[in-house]
Amino acid sequence: MTDEYESYEAVVVGCGPGGAAAAATLARNGVETLVLERGVEAGSKNVSGGVLYAEESAPYTIDDLFPEIRERATERPITKNYIHNIAGQKVKTVDITELHHHDTAWADSVLRRTMDGWLEDQVHALTSETGGGLLTEIHVTGLLREDGEIVGVRTEELDPIRADLIVAADGVNSELARDAGLMDWEEPEEWFQGVKAVVDMPADVIAERFGIDDDEGEAHLFSGDLYDGVRGGGFLYTNRNSLSIGNVFHLDSIVAERAEVSELLDALLTHPLLGRWLGEEYRELEYSAKLVPDSKKVAHPEPHQGRMVLVGDAAGQMQAQGPIIKGMNHAVSAGGLAAEAFVEARSRGNPGKVGDRYEAKLRQSGVMDALRPTAYETTRAVTEHEGLTSLAGSVAQSSVGRLALRSMGGVVERLYNSPRLLSMLPDTRLPYVTLPTVLAEELGERVATTNDVEPPALDERIGDLTYDVGEPHITVQDESWEASGAAVTACPVSATDFGGGCYRAETVSENGSETRVVSLDTQPCIECGTCAVVADTEWEHPAGGKGVAFDQG
């Protein structure tokens, strides 16, 4: 029996935007709420590109719940947005600010350690008023069950805790979602991987190089041929005193191309176009990475089981449709709606109905349609058909296709700024590589700037991170190259000819034959979860407060 365990009305696991939104809404409605955060501080385990959107149509925005957040915890308002289509040293830039502002009340660049750390203080104050609170360095390992029913959570550091509501806001690598059988990590095509460098740049230098004031900021996105055919693209966001520069790629494409993701980041950082903004004084503050769910494929339509609900990345709620990525805003909406559903169910004397109410609210509010757009579902059979995609690529690269692109130069910007068109964008090379490259070749201009940036080597990037190394938290189940070799290149802190990362290729001689195998060292792990998808591993988080701690996020 579990009656002797400590009990709360609600337990929220994770204090990112989704968990913070849920906890704040619960506490403001008088619900006794305990928040459990795995990091030494909220944000120390979190990574985002990232731009936090507040959508006009959203049921909740983060400033609804935390009115001072923009003044206290975000970086810069992102007021302009551009996409740069690249072919060698030719670039065709398209202004997509109209798309950026579509349904947008505001959008700010953020660094997660700063923002989530501030949210932690607000959430702790709110939940303490209702008999709860917030604890850091607590690793929630799974669900507490009684007679097969979910009744609470288990942790590595504390006795089990009972709760009437469990909000799993524990991120893309959610152990609660996996324990419940609601999410899995089986298919690389269902995930993206983001890799980022935070680059030091004083505010006055940002103002000069980007031509912006203190209350302005820019987003720059990159696609085309600079990534050797890997599907995805790059980003640059202006922060107050730094730049966030990185890439987001389809994980299956990284695996198929055996691409080394740190080298793909360097390809962006050293492109002549970025010489416009980066100088010889280039200095990286932090290197980071994370796994990103592709919501149109994995956003769970029924993100609940018993008294547990999933919010944010744990539920696959990350919208990457076209060049603009939205995730934190959907996590906020989901967290608020989950709390709202519990308050309503409790008031009717049936808190066990929270999941059904939450699911209905996600649909009725339009959140699920944004995450899993109908336009994509109805067109993907055609737009992602292998034969048709190959034909379209051939036509685009032909003389006829190039002539058509040149003749419609003035229409390109309108197409890029169409939310409807971008909601149908297929997951193929055509929109990520082929068309941007041809567009740059036919309509682009040669970059006049030079770029003298010399990015740090991978060992330097790892060496600059903060770790409190605990016990190994990943084991390789099948060390054969066929089963787990993809991790050697896909892992952001590993590479084929680098011996200081997590994954290494080794040749074992036995009975006169040689076999290629994979070995693992979890010490430099940045807990992105990539190897859980691309290799045969048993993966869990480190103990609370152990492992990597991001200073920027």
Which role fits each region the language model picked out?
Residues Y5-Y8, E156-L165, H304-R307:
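Core beta-strand elements of the Rossmann-like FAD/NAD(P) dinucleotide-binding domain
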Residues E41, Q122-L274:
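Predominantly flavin-linked oxidoreductase catalytic cores and closely associated redox partners
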Residues H100-D121, I254-E260:
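Short beta-strand to alpha-helix junction loop
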Residues Y227-V230, R240, S253-G336, S347-A360, ...:
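FAD/FMN-dependent oxidoreductases across multiple families
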Residues G485-S513, S519-G553:
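Iron-sulfur cluster-binding cysteine motifs and their immediate structural context
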Residues N29, G39-G88:
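N-terminal FAD cofactor-binding segment of flavoenzymes
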Residues V343-E454:
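C-terminal helical "tail/cap" subdomain of flavin- and related membrane-associated enzymes
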Residues Y5-V35:
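N-terminal Rossmann-like FAD-binding beta1-loop-alpha1 element of flavoenzymes
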